[in-house]
From Swiss-Prot:
HAMAP family: TATA_bind_prot_arch. The keyword Nucleus applies. General transcription factor that functions at the core of the DNA-binding multiprotein factor TFIID. Binding of TFIID to the TATA box is the initial transcriptional step of the pre-initiation complex (PIC), playing a role in the activation of eukaryotic genes transcribed by RNA polymerase II. Signal peptide: none annotated. This is TATA-box-binding protein. Sequence repeats lie at residues 103-179, 193-270. It is found in: Nucleus. The keyword Cell membrane does not apply. GO terms for biological process: DNA-templated transcription initiation. Keywords: DNA-binding, Nucleus, Repeat, Transcription.
Length: 275
């Protein structure tokens, strides 16, 4: 076995490595020239990384502005001259102005399920008035929630003035309880919200003349009769009253979300007619 070992001055070539040492050295030299300056992928120590970053930063400062812009464009992962995509913080449109309409009034109806003697109710109940020559219903008010009820002899009742859906239902139940205490077999049937009214302020004046000319199919504006522009939105089916001052009233909704959707639709239009 000792006779098979090579002499100390002889190097055994590795498998697959050519014996031509000059060509091997030239290939290694080309590979070293093609390797990047940043040794981050090779697991180098942190001081070498910092030194490489500092030297590259100094090289960038020494470049001319035109060469530096070209260099930065070539380093972008999207290619030179390609802008970076918009981040989630970049506003895409004016669809989110940060203005939320406030509910001002909710109108609901309920069926008490019995015939009512309106004179008896008006005489015995508090905060109730009845004038059949003017209006064929008892007008009753309570303080909490601050609402007004119209009570008809057929047993139908309309509740107005609530600021939320919960307050409207609570007020209607209180009115039904008052009628029960007066000796009527009143029930609480078919409660339904019929109309919701909201309002908001866009905080800028609006050119109503230009708006009615552009959107004449959906709007009408007669300042001699009414100072606001009436805009009838198709979807959602909402009527908007738009004033020069920037105040907007939204009515005709059955649910709260319709108010919000209608304002999101109209705000970009109003933005286009800002004075």
């Amino acid at each position: 076995m000792d006779n098979m070992l090579p002499s100390p001055g002889y190097n055994i070539p590795s498998i697959g490595t050519p014996i031509h040492h000059q060509e091997d050295e030239s290939i290694q030299t080309q590979q070293q020239q093609q390797t990047p300056r940043h040794p981050a992928s090779f697991g180098m120590n942190l001081p070498h990384l910092q030194h490489a970053n500092i030297s590259q930063t100094q090289d960038n400062h020494m470049m001319s502005p035109a060469i530096q812009r070209q260099h930065e464009g070539s380093m972008s992962i999207y290619g030179p001259g390609t802008p970076a995509p918009a981040t989630p913080h970049t506003p895409a449109s004016v669809a989110d102005p940060g203005i939320i309409p406030v509910l001002e009034n909710i109108v609901s109806t309920v069926n008490l399920g019995c015939r009512l003697d309106l004179k008896k109710i008006a005489l015995q109940a508090r905060n109730a008035e009845y004038n059949p020559k003017r209006f064929a219903a008892v007008i009753m008010r309570i303080r909490e929630p601050r609402t007004t009820a119209l009570i008809f002899s057929s047993g139908k009742m309309v509740c107005t003035g609530a600021k939320s859906e919960e307050d409207s239902r609570l007020a209607a139940r209180k009115y039904a309880r008052i009628v029960q205490k007066l000796g009527f077999s009143a029930k609480f049937l078919d409660f339904k919200i019929q109309n919701m009214v909201g309002s908001c302020d866009v905080k800028f004046p609006i050119r109503l003349e230009g708006l009615v000319l552009t959107h004449g199919q959906f709007s009408s504006y007669e300042p001699e009769l009414f100072p606001g522009l009436i805009y009838r939105m198709v979807k959602p089916r909402i009527v908007l009253l738009i004033f020069v001052s920037g105040k907007v009233v939204l009515t005709g909704a059955k649910v709260r979300q319709e108010i919000y959707d209608a304002f999101e639709n109209i705000y970009p239009i109003l933005k286009g007619f800002k004075k």
